[in-house]
């Protein structure tokens, strides 16, 4: 499989796609699930409930946010791979996290949920043919391909892993 061309996604997604050098995106999705599964052993209880600044998310909230994004983006990939031309709305992650109870859920439970979501999504991506990978649709007012969505899913997790490592002094990989 090839990487998505820049015309397959909007500029806001470039930073995520750029974090994914792999060409076998299904393998990258799969391997990432195994890496995510090890996170709870790498984060102390004190760190999982700590935010590095006011109005910033705790590691628990970050992982909850990753589950929200996993759900939204896989739904987009499903709709587009089935040639559904209905424009899909964007979503604002800040009110999603604010409306959740992620801050009160142990990291281990949140990670288990994220891993379960990713593993449930993998069969969809494994079955896609080239026509489905190349299918496009509208989401958040931008044209995006199914292929780009998969790359964004992996890159988005990597983006947050980088932030957890830099701002929380955690070793996630």
Region annotations inferred by a language model:
Residues 17-21, 33, 44, 81, ...:
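Generic secondary-structure transition motif, activating predominantly at the C-termini of alpha-helices
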Residues 11-27:
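Short, charged, low-complexity loops and linkers
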Residues 29-57:
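A glycine-rich, hydrophobic loop/mini-helix early in the fold
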């Amino acid at each position: 499989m090839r990487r998505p061309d820049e015309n397959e996604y909007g500029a806001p997604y470039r930073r995520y796609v750029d974090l994914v050098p792999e060409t076998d995106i299904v393998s990258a999705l799969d391997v990432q699930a195994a890496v995510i599964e090890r996170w709870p052993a790498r984060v102390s209880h004190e760190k999982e409930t700590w935010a590095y600044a006011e109005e910033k998310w705790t590691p628990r909230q970050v992982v909850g946010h990753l589950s929200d994004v996993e759900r939204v983006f896989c739904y987009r990939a499903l709709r587009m791979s089935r040639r559904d031309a209905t424009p899909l709305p964007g979503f604002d992650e800040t009110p999603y996290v604010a409306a959740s109870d992620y801050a009160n859920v142990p990291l281990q439970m949140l990670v288990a949920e994220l891993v379960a979501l990713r593993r449930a999504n993998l069969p969809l991506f494994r079955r896609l043919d080239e026509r489905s990978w190349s299918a496009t649709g509208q989401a958040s007012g931008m044209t995006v391909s199914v292929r780009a969505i998969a790359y964004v899913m992996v890159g988005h997790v990597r983006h947050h892993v980088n932030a957890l490592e830099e701002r929380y002094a955690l070793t996630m990989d």
